[in-house]
């Protein structure tokens, strides 16, 4: 009995050991992590794609052709969407922003294209005989005398329609546009004739700025910093995503920034390096200051033919008083504004005195406030604006204006580059324009003395990039990376669609889950992927309409070319992502498990740390150095899987025996059979011929082909008797050599018999093999069934044992509890009886004592 118990215990331990081993293997397998591909994750990186424009060009004057080419832009969105990104911090750098460079090149190209069809003024590089203008009106205003000095009445010889004929023409030129040939002489020439070519702006080209919205192509996004005190560089904690910027007016000006955006809070000082006096300082005001500029002279314009098909527009006469152009600014508002700027600068230089002074010198465009007003280019002296002495004496109760004396030029040095100039045709009538000063461009003087207590700031400008930078400081373009990889436990399994029910996130933008954890963001993949594709389709439709609108033009504008580029770029981005998904075997899937094991060297963080605490942006930075390695492993894994599937498909042809009887297979069998038979017959013929040739060489001469030779009879038959005329013996005879057909028949018969015997043997072997396999399979099934029954009985036995043990445990517990209860009750009874017997015992004691 003891031996039987030991044997049973050993058997049980063996079974439990196997079960424990398999449980350990399953748990170990479940602990592995595998690479999972996600499409539509909110991840981005800095990028420099080609941007396209949107504008409401139709809302402006259609009679003139604006040089900005906004008629070729897509229409603006009437309800632009701006999506805030919670828990997102992004670094911005306005001084290294590709959007600024791109806008700068676009404006240059637009100016060049706008002036291409216009007239070249090379024929005007002739000697000009100029005299002062005679004013018939008697006035004593100093501004008139100043205006008289500003313009000259010039005569010059010009070519007519016939090149060999010349005639004299008269025109008024500004003094800034001509230079004397000799000192004290009345002979002049145009100022740019010896340095650059001059192109006259087309008369119907408008230079008035129209707001331009820069938009990112599909697959990209524009991030916007909404911090009110953002200085242009560093981290921004209030970030949103937009598809287009706000309307930016391409105002070309120096010293003062006009018609831009104002700061929402306090005045902001933006600089790249304040200690470097060569760097510009951009000031954004929180309140705009109105500046009103006018050219009071009522000018007329006349056209002068300077050659076949060429017309030069010049100032013909000035009707009424000749007064100098000027600008007016409210002294109270300006001084308050300058005082705010001074206070902001004082924070950066706490122990020094801040002073403002006029420009120290340079080109006219830099030393003055240059801008375009109604088609004329004004150059205004800002000495009265930047004057610290007047600022200290300022009385806030005054309502006076600061007047800036302005000069006008018609020959403009093109700010786009050196060696090019533009002639602005004169504008008829009185010119007046109102603008808003929204910012300043300043530079700091270098410290001439080491212990100087003053910091001097002067107005500056000239680099139009700073003008665009003052508006684009809060934007940056990023490329959306919808593909993400992360470790998960499942390995190449398909998640059922019913498990991804409605998520209630249909109103989230593509990057709306950027600040969420990876686990929360992965829920919105369907919405984000759908919005990515719909955004591509919508933008492609808008761009195509804008391109079709330009078909009547012989040459696309800058915007048309950029629209084509962005159209191609968006499609390339989408196709590239889809190609990667296809290479990895994840086409059409938002969450795609793979068979690539996760390497802990890529990231050793746990599942909870990754999915519950990290955003997709943080995770992307975590594994950015290993992304290429993971992508290569995904490709290798998919190639191996494709190879395995190909091998499996090759085996599937033999999966069904009925495929053997397919007509195409039988045709293949017949071809093989015919080749085998033909080969055997050919070999027999060759060997027969070789045998005959060999015998002939040995001297053998065959008998007649019809000679019969007797076939030996059997030993049980007697020979015939000729004399008695008995029956002749029926001896069998064979031919010595058969004919070709007979030989072919014998060979074919032998081959068929050989094939029959071999096939019969093969069928018998196959039948025997199938029989053995059937018996083995039957035995295996029987053993499996017995094993299952044994396992079932084992489970049943242990279930009964556990049931009995539980019953015994309950019985024992009940007995123990019952006995304990009885003993407790008995103890209580004894105590109660003893308590009740106390009087009796006392009485009995007293009785005993009294007796």
Curated annotation (Swiss-Prot):
* Location of region: Fusion peptide: 501-520
Chain intervals for the UniProt region annotation (V1)? 130-153
Give a short account of its post-translational modification.
Highly glycosylated by host. The high number of glycan on the protein is reffered to as 'glycan shield' because it contributes to hide protein sequence from adaptive immune system.
> Can you tell me which residues are glycosylated?
87, 135, 141, 153, 157, 183, 194, 238, 259, 273, 286, 298, 328, 335, 351, 381, 387, 395, 401, 436, 599, 604, 613, 625, 662
Region V4, annotated ranges: 380-406
Residue numbers of motif YXXL motif?
A: 700-703
Covalently lipidated residues (S-palmitoyl cysteine) read 752
Q: Where are the transmembrane segments?
A: 673-693
Question: Where in this protein does the record put region MPER?
Answer: 650-671
Q: Please provide the Gene Ontology terms (biological process) for this protein.
A: clathrin-dependent endocytosis of virus by host cell; fusion of virus membrane with host endosome membrane; fusion of virus membrane with host plasma membrane; positive regulation of plasma membrane raft polarization; positive regulation of receptor clustering; viral protein processing; virion attachment to host cell
* SUPFAM superfamilies cross-referenced by the UniProt entry: gp120 core, Virus ectodomain
**In this UniProt entry, which cysteines form S-S bonds?**
53-73, 118-202, 125-193, 130-154, 215-244, 225-236, 293-327, 373-433, 380-406, 586-592
Leader sequence range is 1-31
Report one GO cellular component: membrane
Per the record, ranges on the Extracellular side are 32-672
What residue ranges carry the coiled-coil annotation? 621-655
Other comment: Inhibitors targeting HIV-1 viral envelope proteins are used as antiretroviral drugs. Attachment of virions to the cell surface via non-specific interactions and CD4 binding can be blocked by inhibitors that include cyanovirin-N, cyclotriazadisulfonamide analogs, PRO 2000, TNX 355 and PRO 542. In addition, BMS 806 can block CD4-induced conformational changes. Env interactions with the coreceptor molecules can be targeted by CCR5 antagonists including SCH-D, maraviroc (UK 427857) and aplaviroc (GW 873140), and the CXCR4 antagonist AMD 070. HIV-1 lineages are divided in three main groups, M (for Major), O (for Outlier), and N (for New, or Non-M, Non-O). The vast majority of strains found worldwide belong to the group M. Group O seems to be endemic to and largely confined to Cameroon and neighboring countries in West Central Africa, where these viruses represent a small minority of HIV-1 strains. The group N is represented by a limited number of isolates from Cameroonian persons. The group M is further subdivided in 9 clades or subtypes (A to D, F to H, J and K).
Q: What is known of its domains?
A: Some of the most genetically diverse regions of the viral genome are present in Env. They are called variable regions 1 through 5 (V1 through V5). Coreceptor usage of gp120 is determined mainly by the primary structure of the third variable region (V3) in the outer domain of gp120. The sequence of V3 determines which coreceptor, CCR5 and/or CXCR4 (corresponding to R5/macrophage, X4/T cell and R5X4/T cell and macrophage tropism), is used to trigger the fusion potential of the Env complex, and hence which cells the virus can infect. Binding to CCR5 involves a region adjacent in addition to V3.
Family note: Belongs to the HIV-1 env protein family.
Annotated HAMAP family? HIV_ENV (MF_04083)
Q: What is this protein called?
A: Envelope glycoprotein gp160
- Species of provenance: Human immunodeficiency virus type 1 group M subtype C (isolate ETH2220)
